[in-house]
């Protein structure tokens, strides 16, 4: 494992080791306090462009499930069809994993998806810094390489457009009630929960200029 340093925009540094795809990266540093579910968190579109810090101390011990899909097109075990987080930052990465449904290790998955991962970080201390300072940018740099990547600048980046569906998608067609879902980065499990409640879900892109409800006969409201 190569030595890496997480450098926050206020100059604070945390030193660790690389276990994912080896490339420097910059982005907004955010924390996640979930005790499990790192495959779901990494594939959550709401984390697009962010360096995700996991506060739970041990990560990777149950591997990564396969990318399979349900008949309705939703991923079975993930929240979308790929990793959206720009990097993952953990305290202790377990190279050994064991789970009946595991297909590969977290490191193998990260490398395949070109996503950096670093371990050996005091993530709880890092979380305290982020909690007190608020939104903060950061970089993951390799100690044996010069810092040649710019600070993350999200001005002009439309993340909603990047994660939203491009076409209208229907789930559970013909159900008794219908829900229109404007996709600004929806997780698969939100759609699944709606389907399980017996409704048809019409998933539409985010980029409507206006949603207009026309007049109707009588008191249809």
Model-identified regions with their sequence ranges:
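Conserved small/polar residues in nucleotide/adenosyl-binding loops
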Residues: 212-219
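RNA-binding accessory domains that recognize and position tRNA/RNA substrates
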Residues: 1-178, 182-208
């Amino acid at each position: 494992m190569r030595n890496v340093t997480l450098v926050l925009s206020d100059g604070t540094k945390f030193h660790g080791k690389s276990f994912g795809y080896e490339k420097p990266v910059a982005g907004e540093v955010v924390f996640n306090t979930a005790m499990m579910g790192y495959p779901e968190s990494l594939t959550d579109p709401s984390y697009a462009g962010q360096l995700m810090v996991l506060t739970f101390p041990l990560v990777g011990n149950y591997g990564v499930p396969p990318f399979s899909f349900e008949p309705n097109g939703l991923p079975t075990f993930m929240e979308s069809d790929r990793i959206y987080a720009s990097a993952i930052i953990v305290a202790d990465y377990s190279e050994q994993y064991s789970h009946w449904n595991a297909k590969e290790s977290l490191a193998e998955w990260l490398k395949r998806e070109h996503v950096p991962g670093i371990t050996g970080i005091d993530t709880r201390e890092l979380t305290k810094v982020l909690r007190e300072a608020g939104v903060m940018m950061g970089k993951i740099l390799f100690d044996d390489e010069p810092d040649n990547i710019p600070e993350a600048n999200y001005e002009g980046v439309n993340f909603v457009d990047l994660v939203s569906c491009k076409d209208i998608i229907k789930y559970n067609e013909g159900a008794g009630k219908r829900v229109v879902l404007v996709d600004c980065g929806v997780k698969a499990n939100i759609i699944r929960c709606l389907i399980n409640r017996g409704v048809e879900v019409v998933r539409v892109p985010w980029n409507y200029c206006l949603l207009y409800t026309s007049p109707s006969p009588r008191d249809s409201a």
